[in-house]
């Protein structure tokens, strides 16, 4: 499975990963869904391509717009369950299954959506945006940590930091995946 997780081509411009327009659309969609308590899970790829998880969903190749994201996560629509994966300012897949975190230190009140957001951030360098169906709060995960109830400004700041990531971080993403996989394999006896 490790072979399906491929680092981005480092010769690409860093700003190709996420633009100001994409950041604005993600934030607008997240807080619009939060107002009406529509649950959402949006995974923003960084250095590690999440091909393994992308394949579990329905392939898309769409420019990101807040209207499209809101429609994807609308209750009782074919695409509303699972996660959306964003790569290079495009939605590449919807209804994706993600690994759930088995971290016992996570708050027991967190549901499957939040545990999946933490789970993918434990095995990759992706950032996930989570909208709670229960509370409408917007949270994000990164590096196995969850920040609950973030403001639009804090989310914008975090997303902006992704545009200027240094190339030397690529190896830490691979190391995190290997560590996560090894931990999982050890527990399951594979």
Could you say what each language-model-derived stretch is?
Residues 1-190:
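Divalent-cation
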């Amino acid at each position: 499975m490790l072979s399906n997780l491929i680092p981005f081509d480092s010769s690409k411009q860093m700003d190709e990963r996420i633009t100001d327009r994409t950041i604005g659309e993600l934030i607008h969609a997240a807080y619009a869904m939060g107002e009406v308590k529509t649950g959402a899970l949006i995974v923003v790829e960084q250095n590690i391509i999440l091909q393994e998880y992308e394949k579990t969903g329905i392939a898309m190749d769409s420019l990101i717009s807040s209207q499209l994201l809101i429609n994807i996560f609308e209750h009782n629509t074919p695409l509303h369950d699972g996660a959306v994966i964003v790569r290079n300012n495009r939605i590449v897949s919807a209804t994706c299954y993600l690994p759930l975190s088995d971290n016992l230190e996570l708050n027991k009140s967190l549901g499957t959506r939040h545990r999946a957001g933490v789970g993918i951030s434990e095995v990759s360098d992706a950032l996930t945006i989570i909208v709670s169906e229960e509370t409408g709060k917007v949270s994000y995960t990164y590096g196995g940590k969850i920040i609950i109830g973030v403001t639009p400004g804090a989310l914008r700041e975090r997303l902006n930091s992704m545009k200027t990531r240094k190339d030397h971080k690529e190896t830490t993403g691979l190391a995190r995946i290997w560590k996560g996989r090894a931990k999982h394999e050890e527990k399951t006896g594979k």
